[in-house]
From Swiss-Prot:
This is Vitamin B12-binding protein. PANTHER family: VITAMIN B12-BINDING PROTEIN (PTHR42860:SF1). Keywords: Disulfide bond, Periplasm, Signal, Transport. It holds the Pfam family Peripla_BP_2. It is found in: Periplasm. Part of the ABC transporter complex BtuCDF involved in vitamin B12 import. Binds vitamin B12 and delivers it to the periplasmic surface of BtuC. It comes from Vibrio cholerae serotype O1 (strain ATCC 39541 / Classical Ogawa 395 / O395). Residues 27-274 form the Fe/B12 periplasmic-binding domain.
């Protein structure tokens, strides 16, 4: 359930906001794995002094001190580190502790993303905190160009029904309009639970059987799920046709430049399914 909490929190949307005029920051703390990646993309990696748990990309982030996780923020440690910029995650950071940081007067940038285009916006906005903003601006430009190329490349993909499984016990998926559903729709994917009234519905095997997805996606965090579906081979065409795929969860669930790697991965698998 920890994985689901981390993923679900990422999907919530708050427009990136700047609480103060951007300035070249010298000591930066990131409070979320995706924010750490965005900081590096924006050219701020050498200014990071601490990050959150699970900040494992790029590899040099592993060497930084940990000051936050999904349950808590170590405010005492942050005070000793004296950051001049904190990259926060309002949808995932503990709200009471985040509010305390604001009350203490820290400059905070709220990093949130709902769409693929907003990943580039996030990088670009953070680049203004760098002494060399052209680094982040180029990264944002390159992201937008690659995204446009992918949209053009896969624009003719035929619609295909998919099921994305986030966890096994309980079985949780996502509704349309919540991260990362745009990754699938760009590739021609049609979410079989798109009309769910809740963002991350808990569903039963029987519901999946009734909706008959042509492709089943699982995450690497739930790799055993692929084996779980083998028991239903006689009743699921996706299993019969070997269309059960494990996706790179970090690429897919973190809104960062690597999300475009997830787009290519998903599009490749859906293309295979469309040929059957």
């Amino acid at each position: 359930m920890l994985v689901i909490r981390l993923i679900a929190c990422t999907f919530l949307f708050i427009t990136p906001s700047l609480l103060a005029k951007p300035f070249p920051a010298e000591r930066i703390i990131s409070l979320a794995p995706h924010a750490t990646e965005i900081a590096y993309a924006a050219g701020l990696g050498d200014k990071l002094v601490a990050v959150s748990e699970y900040s494992d990309y790029p590899p040099q982030a592993l060497e930084l001190e940990r000051v936050a996780n999904h349950q808590t923020i170590n405010i005492e440690k942050i005070l000793t580190l004296k950051p001049d910029l904190i990259i926060a995650w309002p949808a995932g950071n503990p709200p009471r502790e985040l509010a305390k940081l604001r009350q203490l007067g820290f400059t905070i940038y709220d990093s949130q993303t709902k769409t693929l285009d907003e990943i580039a916006d996030n990088i670009e906005a953070l680049s203004h905190y760098s002494a060399n903003p052209e680094v982040g601006q180029k990264a944002a430009h390159d992201f937008r160009q690659r995204l446009q190329d992918l949209r053009t490349q896969y624009a003719s993909n035929q619609p295909i029904r998919y099921f994305y499984q986030l966890s096994e016990k309980p079985i949780i998926t996502l509704a349309q309009g919540h991260w990362p559903s745009e990754v699938f729709s760009l590739c021609g994917g049609v979410n079989i639970f798109a009309d769910s009234e809740v963002p991350y519905p808990q569903v039963s095997i029987e519901q999946v059987l009734v909706k008959q997805p042509q492709v089943i996606f699982t995450s690497e965090h739930a790799i055993a799920n692929g084996h779980m579906w083998r028991a239903w081979q006689a009743e699921l065409s996706a299993v019969q046709n070997d269309q059960v795929w494990a996706l790179n969860a970090d690429w897919l669930n973190r809104p960062t430049p690597r999300t475009l790697d997830a787009v290519e991965q998903v599009c490749t698998y859906l293309k295979i399914a469309q040929k059957q």
